[in-house]
Amino acid sequence: MRPLFLLFALVLTHAAHAGGVERLKAFIAGAKTAEADFTQTVADRNNRVTQEASGKMAFARPGKFRWDYRAPYEQVIVGDGAKLWLYDADLDQVTVKPLGEVIAGTPAALLAGDDAIEKYFSLKNAGESGGLEWLEATPKSRDTSFERIRMGFKGDVLVQMELFDTFGQRTTLKLSNFARNPRIAPSRFVFTPPKGADVIGE
């Protein structure tokens, strides 16, 4: 299956002069749901773009999320609170895993997990660059493919994330048309494998 990245969008609504860490903690304490459009770019260690994608995401804390990749391939990622479902429409293949085994140390835990954020990450303010206020999160678990995650805020909004993995790749996520605490139907976080799809892991 092609690489899929568990990324999340959010809006923060606290003081503009707060650092990135304070903004993230305030969001986790107050936001229950979010949805947004996204564009995603993956670059290798030589800064060569190897993958571009776009789509729409939504989450409901704790532990429920959905990422719909619309281009260049149709792919779906769903966390239903207990299991993680990865569906590749082109391959007609579904991969399912227990959510707890894969969420720690990923952006899913950082943004859609529970309130114990510093159980999984070391957080620090990373200063201002490119007109954004940055936060850096380093996973405490060694059993993760991410070395660090940077989150860039403009005013009260998270507009960009950068994920650095153990293979030297950088994934950049840019957000638009986001909504904070929208009403989201519970059925959006339920995934039923399409009839005839190859299901791996269940």
From Swiss-Prot:
Residues 1-18 form the signal peptide. Pfam families: LolA (PF03548). It is found in: Periplasm. InterPro entries: LolA/LolB/LppX, OM_lipoprot_carrier_LolA-like, OM_lipoprot_carrier_LolA_Pbac. It comes from the Bacteria. GO terms for cellular component: periplasmic space. The keyword Signal applies. GO terms for biological process: lipoprotein localization to outer membrane; lipoprotein transport. Keywords: Chaperone, Periplasm, Protein transport, Signal, Transport. Monomer. NCBIfam families: lolA. Participates in the translocation of lipoproteins from the inner membrane to the outer membrane. Only forms a complex with a lipoprotein if the residue after the N-terminal Cys is not an aspartate (The Asp acts as a targeting signal to indicate that the lipoprotein should stay in the inner membrane). PANTHER family: OUTER-MEMBRANE LIPOPROTEIN CARRIER PROTEIN (PTHR35869:SF1). Belongs to the LolA family. This is Outer-membrane lipoprotein carrier protein. It comes from Thiobacillus denitrificans (strain ATCC 25259 / T1). The gene is lolA.
